[in-house]
Amino acid sequence: MLDTIARALQDLGRQVLPTLPSLSQEEVSIIWGNVSEFVRRQLTLHKGVQIPAFGTFTFIRQKLEVGNNKFILIQRPVFIMVEKLVQIHGLKQNKVYTPGEIPIVPLNFVMISLEGPFNRDVVEGCVKETLLFLSRSISMKQNVEFTFKGIGVLMIRDSKVKMRFYKDFLCTMDGSGALAKALANRPGTVDSVLSSREALRKWPSSVLAFPRIELKEMENKLPMETLVEECGENRERKCKLKDQSDKEEGTRDISSPKRLRDRQALFPAKVTNVSLLEKFERSESGGKIMTPESLSYPSCLKHDSEMKPQTSPACQDHNKAGQEMCYVCLQRAQRNSLLYYSEERRREIEDERLIQQYQMLKDQEALFRHQMKSLATREQNQKNAAYNLGVAEAIRNHKNEKPEFYKSFLFDKRPLSPALNALKQEEYSRSLLKQMDNRQENEIKQRQYRELMDRLEQVQLTEELAAQRAKFLKDKMEETQCYKRALDAQIKNKPSRLPPFEPDSSEPIFGKNEGELMVEKQKREQNYMKHQLEAAANHKRKAILHQLVDQRRDLQMLQRTQREHLADRTAELERVNRVNQCLQEDWERSAAMKKQRDLEDKAFERASDKLFLLDQCEKYRRCKQCQRRTSNVGESNLWPLNKFLPGSRLLV
């Protein structure tokens, strides 16, 4: 969006920025102060704020180790610039991963407009057009410092984005002070904390400070030209622009004068000596304004000497431009001498230049020491490498000269040992014989041990074979006995043999004793059938009982479900009726309130200007500084000690 607007600025010029030309620097600062207050209030509630086309204020959580495997969890505020702006201008910022449970709310222009005497369109236009100026300044590779009142300073230097928070703001966020201390002691966040002394410092001329925007270029220059930081002619154009804006204030469209009057009553103007002097000089010189900002540059010394105020000996009018000052305060304001900081600023610029030169010399010296150290290390490494190569070459040559090396020798004819070594030889021979005896004994013991182990293994194997043989015989005998018992049972239960054959017999041969067997068989079958019938009846009875129990359970479940459904329907109907009744009551209450408000608005519109207390107070003018009447010429509210009361002889 910003690049599209930046291109459109070249074609449309002043038409793209309709709001900023009608606002002064103080009004822009007031609007951005309200924006900063809204952001600070949301951050206090642990909510993030998203500024459209600029960035997001939110929190990140980090674990800081404190030793002994202990850590503390801190939640520190961060500013994340929008990715579109970063990509367009090629900026660099630290990658920050924010937790998803922190809510992010957009910038509410309505709430900001309610905090000041500006409507929503003016606030939104001021914010957006200020961000356009910021984008243009970044595109021209200028150093920018964007101040958020009560929060911190956003610094953009050398295409690097850094948000530095005030120490008081961090203490407000944390409460215990551990957050500011932890950020100041960590290497990555040591430059994220801005002390109160650094916050009151003056910006160098190469840094463009926001949100105090110089609108001097919009009248006579193209919108995309560079911002000139010198004072000179640009200061005069700024004065002309302020005069034009003062003239346009009379023709500005105001939707609700009484609402604006109420807002002004809620936010009274803070009048200082400098602002009073500016308005007095405006009425005297016909529109030329003197501000302390125009006196803060070294190149403005000549203009400062020419533009010093001329004080008048007496008071001409007490109500110039709505000042409402008494004679004493007006004379004091006219005799105030402005402070000129040109020499101090020139000294500060010179100190900064010397500090930069000293820092550059230190950096060059450190770089030279590093280079010398690297060169010495390189030379030492070269010497070590050459020495190692020489040693390796010498070892290789030595090996090539003596390729074979014998460690033992064979003598054909060994000379006899001298007589002095005879005792040693005997001792050696005795020790050798002893060693041989010990070795033979060990061999004999080992052989005997092996023979013993072999015999034990043979005995164990013989016992195992005997046990297996006994078990086999036992199993065989048991199997034989089993077969024998089976044959005996078969012989015992063997059916009767066929009757002997008798030729030409008149009596029946088969079926003589079958009647008893048939009767017994029938009885047995009857008993079987009776038992089966009883079992079937019992099974059928159990099935019927289970079915009845299931039906009863289902019926109870259906009844309970029906009762619950009816209860839910009743509760839902009651809730709907209650909601409808509440909505109806709210509607009636809202209608009554709207009717009452309309009546009050109509009565307010019909009322005259002299009916209200604040309007009546306008008849009694008071000095804005000492709160005395405007006709005051030096009287005191204190009762004098030597006051003589008329009609009394007492001297108080």
Curated annotation (Swiss-Prot):
One of its GO terms (cellular component) is plasma membrane. Pfam families: HU-CCDC81_euk_1, HU-CCDC81_euk_2. Residues 238-258 are annotated as: Disordered. It comes from the Eukaryota. Residues 436-493 form a coiled coil. The modification Phosphoserine is found at residues 206, 275, 296, 417. Residues 238-256 have a biased composition (Basic and acidic residues). Its main location: cytoplasm. It is found in: Cytoplasm, Cytoskeleton, Microtubule organizing center, Centrosome. InterPro entries: CCDC81_HU_dom_2 (IPR040673), Coiled-coil_dom_cont_p_81 (IPR026295), HU-CCDC81 (IPR028034). This is Coiled-coil domain-containing protein 81. The lineage of its organism: Eukaryota, Metazoa, Chordata, Craniata, Vertebrata. The gene is CCDC81.
